[in-house]
Amino acid sequence: MEDGVLKEGFLVKRGHIVHNWKARWFILRQNTLVYYKLEGGRRVTPPKGRILLDGCTITCPCLEYENRPLLIKLKTQTSTEYFLEACSREERDAWAFEITGAIHAGQPGKVQQLHSLRNSFKLPPHISLHRIVDKMHDSNTGIRSSPNMEQGSTYKKTFLGSSLVDWLISNSFTASRLEAVTLASMLMEENFLRPVGVRSMGAIRSGDLAEQFLDDSTALYTFAESYKKKISPKEEISLSTVELSGTVVKQGYLAKQGHKRKNWKVRRFVLRKDPAFLHYYDPSKEENRPVGGFSLRGSLVSALEDNGVPTGVKGNVQGNLFKVITKDDTHYYIQASSKAERAEWIEAIKKLT
């Protein structure tokens, strides 16, 4: 990483004039967040834009876009709004932490205050659990329930543990994720919520009160009164649901060479096990459906040379490249943002081939 760089990587940014979404390479420094367009695996200079962080306000989680739950919102002193989407909750929170630190760099006490997690949480006297549940049911601003898959079974009208934590913070019921977990646990204890599926039920059985509600994107919950028996996987099944039913092992933004036009585009890659699949999504699209993917059984993965353009790669694309050859001899050329990231992806994929 260059001197003075606090964090860098891909984020998906909403356009100012036309509200489309495009992947950009962001570099965070002490007082600015700069973003670049990428062409042929390289960032195009000069930068596409620069966000001055002095006087900025940050909203995270930001739930203004229903189909984009991993957003950070920045509002500058001139009231310009930026919406930035990360590839995972962990990555979103890491960006938010660093950006918040950069905004308040001159006030160390403020940074400490912003990131301190309180060990105890008491519900404010003017807010009742009934009121929170009523707001959760609101058709416009409430928590969104939908069918979710876990280990091959579909559960109707459920939501993710991490989504409820985001919602509680966004609606100002709590100030931190730790407080939100405590509040969600209270909702379960009072029988407003019920765990659904192996992951969340397992946490209940563990007996550890501190970890009964999981701030996790694989743990499912539902309103107690809407609990339904799980649908048999035989009733609702297709090839894609089988492929997507595995446990997420790793996810992130990577550049990929197209099969027909050979152009390079940033995609959000999701690696799953049991069954082992690597899917990729178009981050500019609203729907959360993969645009491609393949089984890793019998696949080969290897790093490509960093000196010069490797065979099979179109254009002047060099550095941090790796290749996956599937069982049916389809070649996928992928570029990571650093050697370390490439090594992590290769190691994770190799374990599943």
Curated annotation (Swiss-Prot):
Which residues, by range, are in coiled-coil regions? none
In this record, what's one Pfam family?
DEP
| Record Gene3D superfamilies | Pleckstrin-homology domain (PH domain)/Phosphotyrosine-binding domain (PTB), Winged helix-like DNA-binding domain superfamily/Winged helix DNA-binding domain
Q: Which residues form the PH domain?
A: 4-104, 247-353
**Membrane disposition:** Peripheral membrane protein
Any GO molecular function = phosphatidylinositol-3,5-bisphosphate binding
Q: Where in the cell is it found?
A: Cell projection, Lamellipodium membrane; Cytoplasm, Cytoskeleton
Q: Which UniProt keywords apply?
A: Acetylation, Cell membrane, Cell projection, Cytoplasm, Cytoskeleton, Membrane, Phosphoprotein, Repeat
* One of the protein's GO biological processes: positive regulation of plasma membrane bounded cell projection assembly
List of residues that carry Phosphoserine:
120
DEP domain ranges (all copies):
139-225
Xref: SUPFAM superfamilies: PH domain-like, Winged helix' DNA-binding domain
- Any one GO CC term of the record: cytoskeleton
Q: Which residues carry this modification: N-acetylmethionine?
A: 1
Indicate the secretion signal residues.
none
Its biological purpose: May help orchestrate cytoskeletal arrangement. Contribute to lamellipodia formation.
PANTHER family in the record, alphabetically?
A: PLECKSTRIN (PTHR12092), PLECKSTRIN-2 (PTHR12092:SF2)
The name of this protein is Pleckstrin-2
